[in-house]
Structures are given as C-alpha cells and as structure tokens.
Amino acid sequence: MTDAVTAHEMQQYDQYTINEIGVPSLVLMERAALAGIEVLGAGQFDLSQVLVIAGLGNNGGDGVALARLLMQKGVHVDLLFVGDENRAAHNNAIQLEIAKKYGLTPVNKVKDFRQYTVIVDALFGIGLSKPVPIKLGEMIKRVNAANVPVVAIDVPSGINATTGDIMGSSIRATATVTFAYPKTGLLQGEGVKRSGSIFVKDIGIYSPAELHQFNPEIKEN
C-alpha cells in the first residue's frame, strides 16, 4: 500500500494537480464519483434502494455526482442534500445543477434511514477541522443506529483525516473509498474502527515526487 498522507498533504497534491498539471477539478470530482460507483457495484452491496448524503463541500460534490451517475444507470437513488444549497462550494453547486437537469431532485430530510439498502456518506471530507455541529451529529447517530451498510467517500464523516480522532460524532462505515493515497487518520485511532474495508482509488491525483517518476522534468517538491 502506498504511504499514507495527512489531510494537508492531500490538499496540496489536489491543488497541485489542478493548478500545475491542469486537470480540471470537476474532472477529478467525476472520477471520484466513478470510483465510488466501482466499489458500490462490485457485488458486496444491495443497490435496490440507495441513499446518498451530501454536504456543502467538495466531498458533497463527489456525492452529488455519484448519485446522478447511479440514477443514470437505472439505480433507485435518493439524494439527501444537507444544508443551504446557496452556500454550497462552487463545484458542488455545479454538480447540483447538473443533477437537477438530469431529473434528480435532492430531498432535505429522511424520516427513516432503515428504508435504504445502502447509504453513501459524502457529508464531510478531509477538510473537516472542527467538531461536527450538534444537529448533524444527531443525524449521524441516526444513520449509525439504522444498521444499514454505509460506504464513506474519502473518509467517514466526522473522522479527522490526519489523526483518526472523532470530531464530536462520526459515521461508522462498512467501507471507505479514499482517493489517491490512504489518509493517516484511516489507519490509526478511531479511524481504524470507523472506516471498515478501505479501498484506495487512483483518480489522477499524485504527489510531485510520484509525478517526477513519470516525467523527470517535474520537480519532486
């Protein structure tokens, strides 16, 4: 397994890929969504009734894209968008508009999470740096109590991607689809207990050192 990275390192590699290499951030978001679908569709999960929980950030944008792509494949999927759509990150807002144009209308609440056969967690990603708000923590507890398989996108929501600490409340995932490199927080502390099976997926983000192996003209740092 490739060496694990901290949240800060991953954010640097992400920005390097976008700003220096020139891969558009929306392309990375689509690839992340496709990677999630690859894990969901590998046979371990029942896709007859899927719920995707998406937050306001780019992790939520991954979730919105994933929900739309599932719908396009004929999967019955509900998209629970948590928060004010007007406050969504730029690329997340774009994904929302695309989803709506394809006919996927988000919902803003779910009465009973037990009605779903699998839940995709795209509420918080590696950028979480403060405790989960109490109201969202209560929702996370309801998801955990539903005893439905959960696939987390990048990290289980509420887990610090660097330390593995629980930031107030956290999802208990059956599986975690993480991108480019394992995150240190998935391999220590509560992160180990909350991540389930970890799938590391290549979506086109690399460290400068790794890119140097492809192209020696690229500086290693």
Swiss-Prot record:
Protein EC: 5.1.99.6
GO molecular function: metal ion binding; mRNA binding; NAD(P)HX epimerase activity; nucleotide binding
Sorted UniProt keywords: Isomerase, Metal-binding, NAD, NADP, Nucleotide-binding, Potassium
GO cellular component, one term: P-body
Necessary cofactors: K(+)
Principal EC category: isomerase
Keyword Isomerase tagged: yes
Catalytic activity: (6R)-NADHX = (6S)-NADHX; (6R)-NADPHX = (6S)-NADPHX
Boundaries of every YjeF N-terminal domain copy: 10-211
Keyword Lyase found: no
Residues annotated as binding (6S)-NADPHX: N58, N59, G60, G61, D62, G125, I126, G127, L128, S129, K130, P131, D154
Gene Ontology biological process terms from the UniProt entry: deadenylation-independent decapping of nuclear-transcribed mRNA; P-body assembly
Gene3D superfamilies named in the record: YjeF N-terminal domain
Cofactor note: Binds 1 potassium ion per subunit.
Family: Belongs to the NnrE/AIBP family.
UniProt xrefs under NCBIfam families: yjeF_nterm
Functional note: Catalyzes the epimerization of the S- and R-forms of NAD(P)HX, a damaged form of NAD(P)H that is a result of enzymatic or heat-dependent hydration. This is a prerequisite for the S-specific NAD(P)H-hydrate dehydratase to allow the repair of both epimers of NAD(P)HX.
Name recorded for this polypeptide: NAD(P)H-hydrate epimerase
Naturally occurring in which organism (per UniProt): Weissella koreensis (strain KACC 15510)
